[in-house]
Regions:
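Polytopic membrane enzymes that build or remodel cell-surface glycoconjugates and lipids
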Residues: 1-210
Length: 210
């Protein structure tokens, strides 16, 4: 039974990857839109891309402006620029990949909370979690976060926010394994900090745990 469920998870995640890839494949070569011109071409990539490539990071990574408090978000744009300069494909690929991994986190959050919280058998929990993750991945409300490159801050923050929540849940089920529990809580804290460095709204995470 355990092997069957593990295989089912693998098949579903592969199917989820295929669905998301097909859904957003037409947007991978879409041009920059709206604030992308300012955020990527002027504010971030062109100003800090050359310093990133040459290793002269004293300008790009030690000044608050224009990085503000979204250091991780802007750093991801700089890395994109270092690898592909101003070709939109790489930027869109990162956003789509983030959406896929966020959907995976949603799947595991749903699976664990349903199995443990509602005391359902693993097969039923797997079915409900799969539907939940599928609805999340296909929900058109996320299309802006995926297609709009400058909205990556939302996608990154959401991924780390939900990862912090998942890690906290996993840690809470490790009462008899202190070391494992500590490591999951440490991972949760790390993801929480990464979420804040992506978008400031992640500061609500401690309240969400109450």
């Amino acid at each position: 039974m355990g092997i069957y469920l593990n295989n089912s998870k693998t098949v579903f995640l592969a199917l989820l990857l295929l669905i998301i890839s097909l859904l957003y494949s037409s947007t991978l070569h879409a041009p920059f839109n709206y604030d992308d011109e300012v955020v990527i071409k002027h504010e971030t990539a062109q100003q800090f891309g050359s310093s990133f490539i040459t290793g002269k990071t004293e300008v790009g990574f030690t000044t608050i402006y224009p990085f503000r408090y979204r250091h991780l978000f802007y750093s991801s744009l700089v890395l994109n620029y270092a690898l592909g300069e101003l070709h939109p494909f790489g930027y869109h690929l990162v956003n789509t990949t983030l959406h896929f991994f966020t959907s995976i986190v949603i799947f595991f959050i749903a699976f664990i909370t349903i199995e443990k919280g509602l005391s359902l058998n693993r097969k039923d929990a797997l079915s409900i979690a799969s539907i939940t993750a599928l609805f999340f991945s296909l929900n058109p409300v996320h299309s802006e976060t995926v297609n709009y490159i400058s909205a990556r801050a939302v996608g990154m923050s959401s991924f780390f926010y939900l990862s912090a929540f998942l890690s906290f849940i996993l840690g809470s089920f490790r009462e008899r394994k202190p070391l494992s529990r500590f490591l999951f809580y440490l991972l949760s804290l790390t993801c929480f900090l990464a979420s804040i460095l992506s978008k400031e709204t992640a500061l609500t995470f401690p309240i969400a745990l109450l």
